[in-house]
């Protein structure tokens, strides 16, 4: 990428993300999606995490399954679309674009739809399901976090006849490449890399508060529960994350041994 202005804007974005408090991870994620979407003229964006549940070679997705998704802006039929996609995966009717992404797992990569599917794919029901939601093209950055977990940053073109360009692909790739620490923290904020299941909205809210300097009494007031109740919640959450106290939580967040 040879655009000095865009490079400087991306570096400023990295600085902005580094300055956001750990307890504001959700806001930081939305800021990242919104800013990169503006840079590449995407009308919407999402973050998704996937976990490799099995290494069975017979599995067309190589064991990878989506766990959590966050959209910058809601899309029509979001819940119905997601449920239909999951049913299709379980029944073996899998979108060729999804298979292609799964087979690229383990490498930092960025691609547009036309980079990973043949021309015939655009005549399938899978592409029609995109168009039904107003999506005409997508650009995805795949980010490996560890051997079993990946993050996906997707950017959506909601206008017909204007697919993403090679330059826009390079911009998205570069913007995400320097944020290894951030990608890991986004997954941690959802409990993905350490908990057996993603954190609930209430658990994510509690986690954000535990990453501040507030004592449990003030956290209880914020959540509208008693101090005893919040203490129980804290113990359950820390156990789910595999740490024994708030110091252990901070160590986990910073990527250090507890």
Task: Identify the residue ranges that each predicted region occupies.
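Regulatory input/activation interfaces that engage signals or partners
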Residues: 4-5, 12-23, 27, 31-146, ...
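Short, locally clustered residues in the helix-turn-helix/winged-helix DNA-binding domain
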Residues: 211-212, 254
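Regulatory loop-to-helix N-cap segments in sensory/regulatory domains
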Residues: 157-172
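Allosteric cytosolic regulatory segments
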Residues: 172-180
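Regulatory hinge/linker segments at domain boundaries
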Residues: 185-205, 258
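Short alpha-helical "packing" element that flanks the helix-turn-helix/winged-helix DNA-binding module
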Residues: 203-210, 249
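Intrinsically disordered, low-complexity basic tails/linkers immediately adjacent to helix-turn-helix/homeobox/MYB/SANT
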Residues: 251-258
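Recognition helix of helix-turn-helix DNA-binding domains
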Residues: 213-248
């Amino acid at each position: 990428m040879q655009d000095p202005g865009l490079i400087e804007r991306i570096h400023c974005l990295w600085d902005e993300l580094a300055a956001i408090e750990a307890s504001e991870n959700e806001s930081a994620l939305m800021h990242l999606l919104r800013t990169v979407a503006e840079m590449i003229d995407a009308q919407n964006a999402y973050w998704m995490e996937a976990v490799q549940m099995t290494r069975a070679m017979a599995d067309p997705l190589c064991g990878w399954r989506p766990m959590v998704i966050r959209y910058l802006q809601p899309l029509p039929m979001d819940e119905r679309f997601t449920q239909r996609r999951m049913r299709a995966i379980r029944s073996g009717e899998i979108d060729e674009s999804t298979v292609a992404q799964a087979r690229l797992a383990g490498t930092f990569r960025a691609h547009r739809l036309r980079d990973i599917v043949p021309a015939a794919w655009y005549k399938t029901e899978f592409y029609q399901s995109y168009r039904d939601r107003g999506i005409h093209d997508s650009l995805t950055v795949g980010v490996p976090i560890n051997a079993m977990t990946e993050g996906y940053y997707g950017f959506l073109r909601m206008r017909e006849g204007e697919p993403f360009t090679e330059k826009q692909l390079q911009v998205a790739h570069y913007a995400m490449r320097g944020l290894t620490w951030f990608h890991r923290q986004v997954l941690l904020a959802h409990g993905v890399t350490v908990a057996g299941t993603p954190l609930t909205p209430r658990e994510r809210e509690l986690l954000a508060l535990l990453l501040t300097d507030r004592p449990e009494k003030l956290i209880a007031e914020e959540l509208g529960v008693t101090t005893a109740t919040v203490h129980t919640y804290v113990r359950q959450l820390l156990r789910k994350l595999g740490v024994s106290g708030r110091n252990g939580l901070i160590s986990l967040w910073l990527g250090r041994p507890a």
